[in-house]
A protein has these predicted regions:
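His/Asp/Glu-enriched, well-ordered alpha-helical/loop segment
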Residues: 178-207, 257-258, 283-285, 291-372
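Histidine-rich, glycine-flanked metal-binding segment
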Residues: 1-27
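C-terminal cap of metal-dependent C-N hydrolases
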Residues: 299-303, 359-425
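Alpha-helical scaffold segments that flank or form the walls of functional sites
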Residues: 23, 42-96, 102-121, 138-148, ...
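Histidine/acidic residue-rich metal-binding segments in metalloenzymes
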Residues: 107-285
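Histidine-centered catalytic micro-motifs
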Residues: 28-41, 153-158, 287
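Divalent metal-coordination and catalytic microenvironments
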Residues: 1, 22, 33, 56, ...
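Gly-rich Lys/Arg/Thr-decorated short loops/hinges at beta-loop-alpha junctions or inter-strand turns
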Residues: 31-34, 61-66, 92, 171-182
Length: 433
């Protein structure tokens, strides 16, 4: 299950030889932001670890990092145990967990040391959602503690009070359709929270990750902090690069498919994010895969705030980034490799076990056929969803062969061997440990 040699000419009579002429070979892609088997808005995501990891591997993703949520009153160990029960023996790609911390009493602070020692080295903090969010003082204390221990946090940045006020404003105006969604969470709601987080992180002298960045305004805050010497990492998602907020005005509740938080933005935000990818200002592209069926989405037909927020993406990320990034010249093939594999491996304590093709690294490999042409549709997807948010989208390139821990797991979008995934224990954040 490891790569034994990387050489120009290897002669081994017992080895099976795979001809990959005219193909690219990538280290297995890593999606460091998925939500499988997650309870949201009175329902549970359509994809659990069984179906979600099948979807991942079918598109070329060999490792996912999901979120184990510590609900208030639980220990961190209880949260991790809950998520291991959801994932163990069911995963067709490798998996790890970020720990989402919902409160920060002294007992949780003490427990962090053991958790990090056991290989969970990244954490999720929310600045929004009443059941999960931490106040600013708690965020400061968590960041200081993580910096002591070699952990790092990714943060969902939206101003909770402003979102509540703006949602209420839309309701008072009688705007209950999906068209009101972007107005209820405008770009400055993200930018303010990003700015506040960066100041908290500066006070804590802590590195920080802003997850699912969606706005030009938020990007500017990060660029400004970096100019002051602050250590900030950025993640964005394909939907913020390829879709815009005009979809919320589509008729017949089509807009419901695209209700996510933060919302889809304007074309100018897309452009700013693409430029930031090109100049390496953004480190990773993940998906925030959080899928729901049309029936689940329909819970909010009369009130957009009741639509479960999230969309699928774990399966389509590689082909969308190849088609819309590499083929268009917006990013290079090497940048795609860094954004989808090497950088998340480094940031989340998996490098050089993953994220590189080198002797001793895990044999997670993707053989990429750059010439394949096909069309995305609900019919040809593996994810457990009855629609495709990129329906009819012509794409180029395909994960022709996907190897997980040295075994062929998928070919041309079809899973050929299930349940090859192993749990990944990760190292502390490198600059601190």
């Amino acid at each position: 299950d490891k790569i034994s040699r990387v050489e120009a000419d290897i002669t081994d009579r017992d080895a099976r030889v795979v001809d990959v002429s005219g193909r690219f070979v990538f280290p297995g892609f890593i999606d460091a932001h998925t939500h499988f088997d997650l309870a949201v808005a009175g329902t549970v995501t359509a994809d659990d670890f069984e179906t979600g990891t099948r979807a991942a591997v079918s598109g070329g993703t060999t490792t996912i990092v999901d979120f184990a949520t510590q609900y208030r009153g639980e220990t961190l160990k209880e949260a991790l145990d809950n998520w291991h029960k959801k994932a163990d023996q069911k995963s067709s790609c490798n998996y790890g967990f970020h720990l989402a911390i919902s409160e920060f009493p002294e007992s949780i602070s003490r427990e962090l040391e053991e958790v990090i020692r056991d290989g969970v080295t990244s954490f999720k903090l929310y600045m929004i959602y009443d059941d999960n969010m931490l106040d600013d003082g708690s965020i400061y204390r968590v960041l200081k503690r993580l910096t002591e221990l070699g952990g790092i946090a990714g943060v969902h940045c939206e101003n909770s009070d402003l979102v509540k006020a703006m949602v209420q404003e839309q309701k008072e105006l009688g705007n209950l359709t999906t068209s009101a969604h972007p107005a209820s969470r405008p770009p400055l709601v993200e930018a303010e929270a990003v700015d506040r987080l960066l100041k908290i992180a500066a006070l804590a002298d802590s590195p920080i990750i802003v997850v699912h960045l969606s706005t030009k305004a938020g990007l500017k805050e990060v660029q400004s902090a970096r100019e002051q010497g602050q250590e900030v990492y950025l993640e964005t998602c394909p939907q913020y690069l390829l879709l815009d907020d005009s979809v919320y005005d589509l008729p017949d509740f089509e807009g419901g498919k695209y209700i996510i938080a933060p919302p889809l933005r304007k074309k100018e935000d897309q452009e700013a994010l693409w430029e930031a990818l090109a100049d390496n200002s953004i480190q990773t592209i993940s998906t925030d895969h959080c899928s729901f069926t049309l029936k689940q989405k329909a819970a909010g037909k009369e009130d957009f705030t009741k639509i479960p927020g999230g969309m699928a993406g774990v399966e389509t990320r590689p082909v969308l980034m190849y088609t819309c990034g590499v083929e268009t010249g917006r990013i290079t093939m090497e940048q795609m490799c860094r954004l989808l594999s090497e950088n998340p491996a480094k940031l989340y304590g998996m490098y050089p076990q993953k994220g590189v093709i080198a002797p001793g690294s895990d044999a997670d490999l993707v053989v990429w056929n750059p010439e394949a042409k096909w069309v995305l549709s609900a019919e040809n997807q593996t994810a457990n969803v009855d629609y495709q948010t990129y329906e009819g989208y012509p794409v180029k390139g395909i994960a022709e062969q996907v190897y997980v821990n040295g075994q062929l797991a998928a070919e041309n979008g079809k899973v050929v061997k299930e349940h090859l995934g192993q749990y990944v224990k990760r190292k502390p954040y490198p600059k601190l440990s």
